[in-house]
Regions:
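Short, low-complexity disordered leader/linker segments with a strong preference
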Residues: 1-31, 127, 148, 338-339, ...
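Surface-exposed binding/hinge segments that line
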Residues: 30, 103, 137-184, 206-208
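Gly/Pro-rich hinge or "lid" segments in bacterial periplasmic/extracellular proteins
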Residues: 69-77, 173-227, 231, 241, ...
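Aromatic- and charge-enriched surface segment that lines or borders ligand/interaction sites
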Residues: 55, 89-134, 152, 158, ...
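Extracellular/periplasmic solute-recognition and catalytic clefts
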Residues: 128, 148-149, 205-214, 233-294, ...
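N-terminal lobe/hinge region of extracytoplasmic solute-binding protein
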Residues: 38-95, 126, 195-198
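Detector for C-terminal structural segments
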Residues: 54-63, 208, 212, 217, ...
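Alpha-helical secondary-structure segments
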Residues: 36, 117-124, 154-160, 200-201, ...
Length: 535
């Protein structure tokens, strides 16, 4: 159906994302009601999740679609717990971990009434893993391990891998991997950019650009008893003040991306027990990226000096009071089984426990590199949280070793354009992902010829060698050792990128919203099926 037309009954539903909350304590879900939520964007660039990377597409249209597997909506904070959506069971891999055979639910229908079969699942994944010419698939690199995808019968999909890897199953749970209709993809692979047709818990009702998107309960949804909501309205509002006012006035119940600490405090103070709060470490991390093609940032000594100047252990605690950052960590999501311990981090330049020793070494390196009076411009994004706050903090840290930095702050579009064109000396970036999958999440740190997300303009065969070993390693202990070796190489030995504190998700929302639990990403758990309203 056209994404601008209304062809099914209206209904509203929303999904929140915040910090871990207790289970509903035996409460019986109530059916019905419309959930209004705010989306912190003016509009999604398109409705095709296969080609987009923004939460605006997920928050707008995820309720209309199904996926093959997903994070467990009852345990979304886990980095290892995956459950079926369209499949009937998570399979055990065969042939040395290189073959995964999924059985697909029977009786699933697209919203136009046509049956969904294994052929649709295979075609959708083929579209993502091996996109046809002219079709954008930004996560194609996530599936380098996939060889072929077959649908030998209407209820079976088989993934054949080139090699066994623990990165495959988490990659398969990617929330952008919506299942489309094979016949539609065959006819026009770009049809889904402007149209919506899925098999999810809600049916599309109406879309008004810059205003709202509406969905209604799918009465034929295959997961019987769900969804609880009669429908949802997602309200677009790119200004934070507008979103906060909407929640305060109960025109909206929640905003799934998250707010800074000050907004949490404001809403709790004003509304008391009418507001609940969930928080979580966020699978988003800030980092500084020097342009290796710009002198003196082609010199590892200069890059290393810049990371040594930063007092992450003390500075992060202060920054967390005003910005949505909190956790000191490496290139790997904190708390993941592959993440290094704090003791290991203390071995890495920029994470030493003695900041004075660290800054003395930074000054020595700058002098040795002939860059004692270093001045440069930091390219930053015109977004308060956390970009501007982190930018102010980091420039102050550098001043403590005599480095003078000014900020060039650009709107998101020109900021991205400058990155892609290499028109910067040093840039403040963010590395955000959905499902925690360290072997995939570190891809922006790979050489520029390999990763389109690396704007540092460097090639590093040694780094690639370590990564390839980790990707192919199936022993968890050996893999963890290799990933620490990779992290130390990126963050210390070459200091290709300066890893800053990981973000922290804070989601204050109306306490009548029930059935939702936080995850580590604002991309996850957004189909709204489990949410219900206690009013």
């Amino acid at each position: 159906m056209e994404a601008t037309s209304a062809t099914v009954a209206v209904s509203l539903g929303v999904l929140l994302i915040g910090a871990p909350i207790a289970a509903t304590g035996g409460e019986t879900p109530k059916n019905g009601g419309i959930l209004n939520y705010v989306i912190p964007a003016d509009a999604p660039p398109s409705f095709d999740a296969h080609r987009e990377t923004t939460f605006a597409t997920i928050h707008s249209a995820a309720p209309f679609y199904s996926v093959l597997i997903r994070v467990d909506p009852n345990n979304p904070s886990s980095t290892t717990d995956f459950v079926c959506d369209l499949c009937t069971a998570i399979p055990q891999p065969a042939y040395g971990g290189t073959t995964y055979t999924f059985k697909i639910r029977s009786g699933v229908k697209f919203h136009d009434g046509s049956p969904l079969t294994a052929a649709d699942v295979a075609a959708s994944w083929e579209h993502i893993v091996h996109p046809p010419e002219g079709v954008l698939s930004p996560r194609e690199l996530h599936y380098v391990m996939v060889d072929t995808i077959d649908a030998p019968d209407p209820t079976t999909v088989v993934f054949h891998l080139k090699f066994a890897t623990s990165a495959f199953l988490p990659a398969l749970a990617d929330p952008y991997s919506w299942i489309y209709k094979k016949a539609t993809l065959d006819h026009d692979p770009r049809w889904y950019e402007k149209n919506i047709l899925g098999s999810g818990p809600f049916k599309f009702v109406e879309y008004q650009v810059g205003q709202w998107i509406k969905g209604a309960k799918n009465p034929d949804y295959y997961d019987k008893g769900l969804p609880h909501l009669a429908g949802f309205t997602g309200i677009y509002a790119d200004k934070q003040a507008v979103r906060v006012d909407a929640i305060r006035a109960d025109r909206a119940a929640i905003e799934f991306r998250g707010f800074p600490p000050s907004v949490r405090d404001e809403l709790v103070s004003a509304l008391g027990d009418k507001i609940a709060v969930q928080t979580s470490d966020w699978n988003c991390g800030s980092f500084i990226e020097p342009n290796h093609k710009k002198k003196p940032f082609d010199d590892a000594r200069v890059r290393r000096a810049l990371t040594l100047a930063i007092d992450r252990w003390h500075g992060t605690a202060a920054l967390a009071k005003i910005a949505n950052v909190r956790t000191v960590g490496s290139v790997i999501f904190p708390g993941d089984p592959l993440a290094p311990s704090n003791e290991q981090l203390h071995e890495v330049a920029g994470f030493w426990s003695d900041i004075e020793k660290s800054r003395t070494e930074a000054k020595r390196l700058l002098k040795e590199a002939g860059a004692e009076n270093l001045t440069f411009e930091l390219l930053n994004r015109d977004v308060d949280q956390p970009y501007k706050y982190v930018g102010i903090w980091i420039t102050d840290e550098w001043s403590k070793i005599g480095v003078k930095v000014t900020q060039k702050i650009l709107p998101s579009g020109p900021w991205v354009a400058a990155e892609r064109a290499g028109d910067f000396a040093v840039v403040l970036q963010a590395n955000c992902h959905s499902v925690v999958n360290p072997l995939i999440d570190v891809q922006p740190y790979l050489s520029s010829s390999i990763s389109k997300q690396n704007y540092g303009n460097y090639e590093d065969p040694k780094q690639q060698e370590i990564f390839d070993k980790a990707l192919h390693e199936t022993d968890p202990a050996q893999q963890k050792q290799l990933m620490f070796q990779f992290a130390k190489h990126v963050m210390d030995i070459e200091a290709h990128k300066l890893v800053l504190p990981w973000w922290y998700r804070i989601v204050p929302y109306r306490s009548y919203v029930k059935g939702w639990k936080i995850s580590s990403s604002h991309y996850l758990n957004q189909d709204l099926a489990n949410i219900w309203l206690d009013k």
